[in-house]
């Protein structure tokens, strides 16, 4: 439930996810947020019940690849495409390791203590 607008006006889903389908210099932000691209991202949130793993780059790289495949955003910086191409295998392995560490931490430090996340619709 956030976004980033870079200095060129490209509206990205996150400061670290350098992909966009629209630019605020060409379209109102309200319209951009209702685009199929942003709707697809919101439909997948939270990406995981474990709120320690909210990122579509580090924690759930498959989601970033799916969204890019479905909506064909343009990269907003040089090298952005490597996240959904060249680095896919390494990111998938890293995500598995992150889950191996953070899932038990989530269970122990949050679920076991009765924490129930309140999701924003």
Describe these PLM feature segments.
Residues 1:
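Structured beta-strand/loop patches that form or line metal/cofactor-binding pockets in enzymes
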Residues 5-6:
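Short, acidic, Ser/Thr-enriched surface-loop or helix-capping motifs
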Residues 16-121:
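Flexible mid-to-C-terminal extensions adjoining Fe-S/redox cofactors in radical SAM and related proteins
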């Amino acid at each position: 439930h956030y976004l980033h607008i870079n200095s060129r006006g490209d509206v990205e889903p996150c400061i670290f996810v350098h992909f966009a389908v629209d630019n605020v210099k060409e379209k109102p932000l309200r319209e951009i947020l209702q685009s199929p691209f942003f709707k697809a991202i919101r439909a997948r949130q939270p990406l995981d019940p474990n709120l320690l793993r909210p990122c579509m780059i580090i924690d759930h790289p498959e989601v970033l690849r799916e969204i890019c495949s479905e909506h064909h955003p343009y990269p907003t910086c040089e090298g952005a495409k490597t996240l959904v191409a060249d680095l896919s295998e390494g990111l998938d392995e890293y995500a598995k390791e992150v889950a191996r560490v953070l899932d038990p931490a989530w269970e122990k430090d949050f679920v076991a203590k009765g924490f129930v996340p309140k999701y924003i619709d």
